[in-house]
Design a protein with these regions (language model features):
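N-terminal active-site beta-alpha-beta segment that forms phosphate/nucleotide-binding
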Residues: 1-109
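Conserved phosphate- and dinucleotide-binding cores of soluble alpha/beta proteins
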Residues: 72-180
Length: 180
């Protein structure tokens, strides 16, 4: 079965249970421990849930930022500061986002970026949603890159092109896969 079909069949229970384990694994990584500023996506649809991760980031005193799609034609995004007082608004794709006037966090200040995916492989290649927002954003940062993916959505091999940025790690409920 193709990834899209598998993804649609994922139950909320499976996603919730896998997300809890994945969050625990992320919080135990060296990348998390070292990070002062973390950019984390807000989950949408069948993505690994991130609300517990964001809560822990705040509890651990880390500076949290989330993506804001600033140009849907050119597929450009920025990192915006996210606090427990930030009022989110529905974005261009129905994903909750910070308001456009929220403080921008420069890419070079971000230590860790937690990315969503449609699928990943064990070589730490990521298949995104196809718009290329992260592919355009990631070259501007030296942050550690970790994608969260349920094991059921892992692929044997993700095709890559010159614009794809390899990840440092992929975390599933079963393992942490590292590049190299």
């Amino acid at each position: 079965m193709e990834i899209a079909g598998i993804r649609e069949e994922l139950t909320d229970r499976y996603i919730t249970e896998a997300s809890a384990v994945i969050a625990d694994r992320l919080l135990e990584t060296e990348e998390y421990s070292r990070a002062n500023t973390v950019m984390c996506y807000l989950d949408y649809g069948k993505e690994v849930r991130t609300s517990a991760i964001v809560e822990r980031l705040w509890a651990d005193g880390k500076r949290v930022c989330i993506p804001l799609c600033t140009d849907t034609k050119a597929h450009i995004m920025e990192a915006k500061l996210y606090t427990d007082e930030t009022v989110l608004v529905p974005g261009a794709y129905g994903i909750m986002e910070p308001p456009a006037d929220a403080e921008t966090v420069p890419a070079e200040e971000i230590d860790l970026i937690v990315l969503p995916c449609v699928s990943c492989d064990r070589s730490c290649n990521r298949l995104g949603h196809g718009a290329g927002y992260y592919d355009r954003y990631l070259p501007g940062t030296d942050a550690s890159l970790i994608a969260l993916c349920t094991e059921k959505l892992m692929s044997d091999e993700i095709p890559v092109d010159e614009f794809d940025v390899p990840l440092d790690a992929v975390i599933t409920e079963n393992d942490i896969y590292r590049r190299g």
